[in-house]
Amino acid sequence: MIRFTLSQLAAIAHGERQGSDVAIDEVTTDTRKVTAGCLFVALKGERFDAHDFAEQAKAAGAGALLVSRPLACDLPQVIVNDTRQAFGELAACVRQQVPTRVVALTGSSGKTSVKEMTAAILSQCGNTLYTAGNLNNDIGVPMTLLRLTKEHQYAVIELGANHQGEIAWTVSLTRPEAALVNNLAAAHLEGFGSLAGVAKAKGEIYTGLPENGIAILNADNNDWLNWQAVIGDRKVWRFSPNAANSDFTATNVQITSHGTEFTLQTPTGNVDVLLPLPGRHNIANALAATSLAMALGADLAAVKAGLAQLQAVPGRLFPIRLTESQLLLDDSYNANVGSMTAAVQVLSEMPGYRTMVVGDMAELGAESAACHREVGEAAKAAGLDCVLSVGALSADISRASGVGEHFNDKAAVVARLRELLAEHKIMTILVKGSRSAAMEEVVRALQETGTC
């Protein structure tokens, strides 16, 4: 990150400095990640107040504090009205000091995949920074921006939200040249109230574009019509694996044992691509990533090379061989209606006895039962052989699937899976649920017990 002094921080955040004007090379909001001489940002939430841990941060080696009230702790401090806002303002200042070319993306599902794909392509062109993990909220985005240096030629920033206004804030810090909403689905409905609320929140990403920026839209979602007022006269690119009139599309699609092969069509020409990831939905993700990367000047050679080097990551359709003919797909990291139905499609194209193991989908509010039934109906339409559910809500999935069984605990699910593995020599299992469902426990148990 770029070094700054406390007096500079005070000026940026309209705060008051107390104590020495020390220089800062590292920033953290977590006492477990304190490094010698770093700035500890004391955030305050509904259930916590990090001001209470200032002495702990000092003991771990922190060199200064960013606080919203003066503390007796014997460390230099900058006192501001709101540490969360000041943290963002500091990140915005760092962003303004670097020549890095930046793109930003959001969406209901596939954000991380698109981020990883975009970064893989841009890394073929130069030094690229991208969001680590899922640090995509109003704390994670500033933390990512603070990692920028003048050596970074490109940056790919993922933006997430669980309430209105969050993306408007984080995109104002990010200042991207191109921005994209990957897709829209029922996710975080408790925070947004409806799918229309989700669309409004995600569309905030386009408010951060300059007049000559590029707004990238999923042509398969009609919600972009609601964003026209935000996008204005900015240049628009559309992507879709289905719509032939899109700027970025795919033809000659072939699903192989190595992944997915297709011809990627772009405004500057076509290129044959091997995407070493399962699932047709990843074609759409690859088109989205290509559009973002090409907005910053990536060529077709970089696109082809970048996509070819991708690897599945645990929790996101990660393939695990139980036996030579029995495959476990670990998609347990998270779930909403869009990603669940995409997973159904992936499983439907796999060999053998196709079994989906599902946990609850969280944060769906009043639409929860309907959303779970929708996934079950998708499983039925896709012709899956078996759906096993566990959790208070997911019974609606197995019931609507027509081939389902519901269980009260994961141990019972694992026991049933072991029976099915013994019965079916060729079998594919896909495990998925929201983060709170902790479906990785099923994956881990299957790996530990195998098929005996």
Give the predicted meaning of each segment.
Residues 1-89, 93, 278, 348-352, ...:
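N-terminal leader/targeting and accessory segments in enzymes
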Residues 8, 86-219, 224-232, 419, ...:
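Phosphate-binding loop of NTP-binding sites
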Residues 33-42, 146-155, 344-365:
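Mobile, glycine- and charge-enriched loop segments
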Residues 47, 313-315, 332-406, 452:
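Active-site beta-alpha connecting loops in nucleotide-dependent enzymes
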Residues 67-74, 178-327, 352, 377-386, ...:
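Acidic, Mg2+-coordinating active-site environments of NTP-dependent enzymes
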Residues 105, 111, 314-318, 436-442:
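ATP-dependent carboxylate/acyl-activation modules
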